Amino acid sequence: MSGISKLSDFWVEKYKKESKKSWDKFYKRNETRFFKDRHWLDREFDCYFGLPDKLPLTILEVGCGVGNLVYPLLEVQPNLKIYCCDFSPRAIDFVKKHSCYNENRVFPFVNDITEDSLLEVLGSACIDTLTAIFVLSAIPREKQLRSIKNLASVIKPGGHLVFRDYCDGDFAQEKFMTSGDPSMIDEQTFVRQDGTLSLFFREEDIAEWMKSAGFGLVTLDRVNRTVDNRKRNLNMKRTFLQGVWKKL
């Protein structure tokens, strides 16, 4: 724990309260340039998105950002109907401005999953597969269970939630812990310089929250990657959690 400066209660509450504003500023500053398109999702989770000759599936992506997952997925799965939400209005605007936007296939909307009912928007449990890719880590620990229950409310019985996010022990967490800057909310949650939150999950925590929300575990694994940063002469050992749960 040496080298870590914990934030005061005042700043912890301020960063949590202004999280939505911080993400909207992030998209104002970076527009569509920051995140790469996620072309790996259909490879990692292909059986949860169906094949082109199967019946259409209804997908919900939470924390969709500017559409880096939505549009690559539509390219390879033409029968999908995708709802997507983000709590940044600016991000949703970028989704709608995308050159491949089709209002008959893509249905973007603003939603804060920690507070806003998804069921009120969708009207029923109509989702076959829900994706939560690097989104729950932006939510404080105390709001995790409520948020996951919100996700569960719109998934069909037998439908699936697919998940990938930051894991305890990741290089980025170690960087936070040795930076010397006052950025720590707790041992697993930190504040980036732009004011956004980053929670590093432990397997037992996410497994318990999912179970309490009415999901049965299909698979949960650590994914280890080594990323070379040649400019900074760094070998970064990235560690993510990747899992699938079934709505009971």
Swiss-Prot record:
GO MF entries: tRNA (cytidine-3-)-methyltransferase activity
Q: Name the EC number(s).
A: 2.1.1.-
**What does the UniProt entry report for the null mutant?**
Cells lacking trm141 show abolished N(3)-methylcytidine modification in tRNA(Ser). Cells lacking trm140 and trm141 show abolished N(3)-methylcytidine modification in tRNAs (tRNA(Ser) and tRNA(Thr)).
Enzyme class, top EC level, equals: transferase
Q: Where in the cell is it found?
A: Cytoplasm; Nucleus
Residues binding S-adenosyl-L-methionine: 23, 27, 63, 86, 112, 133
Q: Could you tell me what this protein is called?
A: tRNA N(3)-methylcytidine methyltransferase trm141
